[in-house]
Amino acid sequence: MNAIKNNISLQAQNLSYSIGNQKIIDNVSLSVNKGEIVAIIGPNGAGKSTLLRLLTGYIKPEHGQCDLHGTPIEQWPAEQLARTRAVMRQHSSLSFPFSVEEVVAMGRSPHGIHHKQTAIDTVIEQTDCQALRHRDYRQLSGGEQQRVQLARVLAQLWHPTPIECCLFLDEPTSALDLYHQQHTLRLLYRLTREQPMAMCCVLHDLNLAALYADKIFLLHKGKLVAAGTPEEVLNDHTLRKWYQADLGITRHPETQQPQIYLRQ
């Protein structure tokens, strides 16, 4: 692998992707640095999940390139990529009666048996899944399944000595109650500060993005229309223009970050 020359973990340049004659992603460039959380936001149909699939290498762009740690993502050996990059999809269903612990253990498959149980125990505790450990995954609520899937991808990236890695999450809080939304994003924020981890997630909740993201990319009909800090992106003019919603903006009483509310 090429040496990492700076803090950039992921660099996407001029990504474009179409289905038939429909342009889904149109000339998008962005970067994600280690030690930060990047949020991708945008209205329904903006192309957020498709962009995430391009960034992770699950699909190939028709134009442009995505580099992970300085190397084109398609050039990474599959097993090495799996130990360095993990993806939590929006929906994950299972047909067979796996226990929660067995689902979490799937994340360790790129590592073999090395440190397997330590990794599983660590991430189950981090994600507040201790009480779910022996339950049938199929019988869990949507929010509980979401926490288990987060534990799985964290297990995939767990190393006894942390290494540079990238975590991609597609709406990781969409099914969670308030406590677990806060618990999850506090955990993810802490991990990016304590480890050389870069994190990129699709979020619909703009207030969570404002509180926890270091950078925000706003997507609209496949185009990147705004990028910057929460302060720079989450303003009245930008949000009204691209979301077409009657909204207002106030300030969080503790952080002074923008907080969005819908008018009655």
UniProtKB/Swiss-Prot annotation:
Membrane topology of this protein: Peripheral membrane protein
Superkingdom in the source lineage: Bacteria
Amino acids binding ATP: G42, P43, N44, G45, A46, G47, K48, S49
InterPro entries (alphabetical): AAA+_ATPase (IPR003593), ABC_transporter-like_ATP-bd (IPR003439), ABC_transporter-like_CS (IPR017871), P-loop_NTPase (IPR027417)
Pfam family, one: ABC_tran
EC assignment: 7.6.2.-
Subcellular location: Cell inner membrane
GO terms assigned for molecular function: ATP binding; ATP hydrolysis activity
Cellular-component GO terms for this entry: plasma membrane
Domain ABC transporter positions: 10-246
This protein's UniProt keywords: ATP-binding, Cell inner membrane, Cell membrane, Membrane, Nucleotide-binding, Translocase, Transport
Broad class of the protein's primary localization: membrane
EC main group: translocase
Function according to Swiss-Prot or TrEMBL: Part of the ABC transporter complex HmuTUV involved in hemin import. Responsible for energy coupling to the transport system.
Alphabetized PANTHER family for the sequence: HEMIN IMPORT ATP-BINDING PROTEIN HMUV
Sequence similarity: Belongs to the ABC transporter superfamily. Heme (hemin) importer (TC 3.A.1.14.5) family.
Quaternary structure, from the entry: The complex is composed of two ATP-binding proteins (HmuV), two transmembrane proteins (HmuU) and a solute-binding protein (HmuT).
Protein's recorded name: Hemin import ATP-binding protein HmuV
Organism for this UniProt entry: Photorhabdus laumondii subsp. laumondii (strain DSM 15139 / CIP 105565 / TT01) (Photorhabdus luminescens subsp. laumondii)
Gene it is expressed from: hmuV
